Amino acid sequence: MANQRIRIRLKSFDHRLIDQSAQEIVDTAKRTGAQVCGPVPLPTRIERFNVLTSPHVNKDARDQYEIRTHKRMLDIVQPTDKTVDALMKLDLAAGVDVQIALG
């Protein structure tokens, strides 16, 4: 797999979980002899919701909620066949969304 790159994007609502998963990927890639760039923290997406607490009047009384989506990106440069096999067998946490792109 000469002159190839694997780009991995991770998304999660919990920053501790995403950092732990990124560290597992980095350790696995380095153990199999590939170079790793990252993890690079990407901007956190913050969604805010305002909900009226009263069912009828009192528009001033509201609850505010937010969801933070944390993102990380890793580049694995010059992956070996062992690296690809190890990444396929890697078991990550359920709360982490993984997107893999070959380039």
Swiss-Prot record:
SUPFAM superfamilies: Ribosomal protein S10. GO terms for cellular component: ribonucleoprotein complex; ribosome. One of its GO terms (biological process) is translation. It comes from the Bacteria. The keyword Transferase does not apply. Keywords: Ribonucleoprotein, Ribosomal protein. InterPro entries: Ribosomal_uS10 (IPR001848), Ribosomal_uS10_CS (IPR018268), Ribosomal_uS10_dom (IPR027486), Ribosomal_uS10_dom_sf (IPR036838). One of its GO terms (molecular function) is tRNA binding. SMART domains: Ribosomal_S10. HAMAP family: Ribosomal_uS10 (MF_00508). Involved in the binding of tRNA to the ribosomes. Belongs to the universal ribosomal protein uS10 family. Part of the 30S ribosomal subunit. This is Small ribosomal subunit protein uS10. It comes from Psychrobacter sp. (strain PRwf-1). The gene is rpsJ.
